[in-house]
Amino acid sequence: MPIITDVYAREVLDSRGNPTIEVEVFTESGALGRALVPSGASTGEHEAVELRDGDKDRYMGKGVLKAVENVNEIIAPEIIEGDFSVLDQVSIDKMMIALDGTDNKGKLGANAILGVSIAVARAAADYLGVPLYKYLGGFNGTELPVPMMNIVNGGSHSDAPIAFQEFMVLPVGAPNFKEALRWGAEIFHNLAKILKGRNLSTAVGDEGGFAPTFEGTEDAVETILEAIKAAGLEPGKDVFLGFDCAASEFFENGVYDYAKFEGENGKKRTSSEQVDYLEELVDKYPIITIEDGMDENDWEGWKALTDRLGNKVQLVGDDLFVTNTKILERGINEGVGNSILIKVNQIGTLTETFEAIEMAQKAGYTAVVSHRSGETEDTTIADIAVATNAGQIKTGSLSRTDRIAKYNQLLRIEDELFETAKFKGLNAFYNLNK
């Protein structure tokens, strides 16, 4: 029987050497589910709470023993005494939400709740003898996502003097995921050669992208375009560009202050000037997606950006929407953004994650399944991307095992799906005038 007999959590480490939580779910049948929870560096203020211990004598205050204790001493007894089956995903998720009793999961911690939620799903897949993506998506989950590859890191993810947090390449012209991954890897390695030729650093940031001391945003973009061409690919046809501006990280007192990351060369821009600047970049370069181009609370700015660019560029809300259906609903009603970034730990359960994806897709918004800057070897987001036919995944650069693990899982899934596997490429951006 798939009745849950034990739930156990422990403190482990993420890709930055910071503590995170791992949860295991055991059943009468012997089926097992294990999940590790990611962590973000730049976080939206409306995200669900990641519970940390705050004990400066352990891991500089970043320990997660409280979250571990909440799983082992509060959540686990409720599940075991309730005779829950691993197939009761929605019921278990709703029980944990009620047990927490707060709007932001601040009592038990979203990291504690999410670890259990994913581990339950993995145990269910193990019990049924099917891959996780098939358990979550049934026979409909056949679309491999376009990878959004973060090959240059800036902002809060590196020490590079660039305000924008991520510069991404999207190999939309590839015939399948396997080739898209190869294209990305070849761009990455060609970029390394170019950087070495300029005596620039090839050290990598949190998400595996390079973090050299470029002379500014346009220098970074021009260098990436050079790498695309060096890989034998055509910008604007085979490969498009994307930014994660993470604008909330440098928005202060109503001003987008690039000097926070770029020093004396950084400009200060008003909300309208920020929109103008992003439009200039879109007009100049083959950019297909911009994430968090405006501050999470600058709804007027977001609306202006959407009115200006929303028909030709994917405008992704990360800090804006934080995988929250209530906030997403407001965005849909007000015509703000046209895409949502999906981060499982922003909301805290698989059930709520799937609800956000469904709401977005029904409204004609795209959904981009995403990692966090503090990752683990857990590959759940790869399965979620396929299960929901999200069409896009953002899981870092072409280095660091914590990033590559997700890409390798997608390669396995593509092989398993065989002839039923789909890769839509440019058509994954279904709400743009291409």
Curated annotation (Swiss-Prot):
PANTHER family linked: ENOLASE
Pfam families: Enolase_C, Enolase_N
InterPro entries: Enolase, Enolase-like_C_sf, Enolase-like_N, Enolase_C, Enolase_CS, Enolase_N
Listed GO CC annotations: cell surface; extracellular region; phosphopyruvate hydratase complex
Cofactor comment text: Binds a second Mg(2+) ion via substrate during catalysis.
Molecular-function annotations in GO: magnesium ion binding; phosphopyruvate hydratase activity
Binding site for (2R)-2-phosphoglycerate: Q165, K343, R372, S373, K394
Name of the gene encoding the protein in the UniProt record: eno
Annotated family: Belongs to the enolase family.
GO biological process: glycolytic process
Name of the protein this chain belongs to: Enolase
Annotated compartments: Cytoplasm; Secreted; Cell surface
EC class (word): lyase
The reaction(s) this protein catalyses: (2R)-2-phosphoglycerate = phosphoenolpyruvate + H2O
